């Protein structure tokens, strides 16, 4: 129970191997980390007009979109339409894309299928530069019980993160 290689529950970057489909923790240390251009963003005091979006599905192309594509192609349309906030869905790492991001495996890691942590930071920074607040749609009760890439049986205790029989 709980033996073997596991992804740490607090990991901040998880990637999936294209061939084996196995997820692994990864240290993200770019030579030049992203520096936010908009240092102190404050959202508007007027009511939020929220555009709910999914980075992977918010594309014209029939593929999983990226943070960069969203920043370049979708965000300008959101700004032009007059929204002052985006609510980004499915942002945490999740093994099954069809879950719409609600079977979270790594709560502290942004989904690597959309790009790098720095590309996500650039998306947020660009939104802020355009006066757009960013809300992350994070649902703490939607975790996968998977043992390979999730929190199931993490330390040999199936009840550490989940109720028995749930």
What are these regions (language model features)?
Residues 39-45, 54-166:
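Substrate-binding/active-site clefts of carbohydrate-active enzymes
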Residues 1-52, 57-62, 69:
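The feature marks proteins involved in alpha-glucan
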């Amino acid at each position: 129970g709980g033996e073997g290689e596991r992804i740490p529950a607090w990991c901040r970057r998880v990637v999936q191997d294209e061939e084996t489909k196995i997820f692994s923790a990864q240290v993200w240390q770019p030579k030049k980390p992203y520096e936010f251009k908009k240092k102190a963003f404050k959202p508007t005091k007027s009511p939020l007009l929220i555009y709910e979006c999914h980075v992977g599905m918010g594309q014209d192309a029939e593929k999983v979109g990226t943070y960069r594509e969203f920043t370049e192609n979708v965000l300008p349309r959101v700004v032009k339409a007059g929204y002052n906030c985006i609510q980004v869905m499915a942002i945490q790492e999740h093994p099954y894309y069809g879950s719409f991001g609600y079977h979270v495996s790594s709560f502290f890691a942004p989904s690597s299928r959309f790009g790098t942590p720095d590309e996500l930071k650039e998306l947020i920074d660009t939104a802020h530069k355009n006066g757009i607040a960013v809300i992350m749609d994070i649902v703490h009760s939607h975790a996968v019980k998977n043992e390979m890439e999730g929190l199931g049986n993490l330390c040999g205790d199936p009840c550490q993160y989940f109720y028995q029989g749930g």
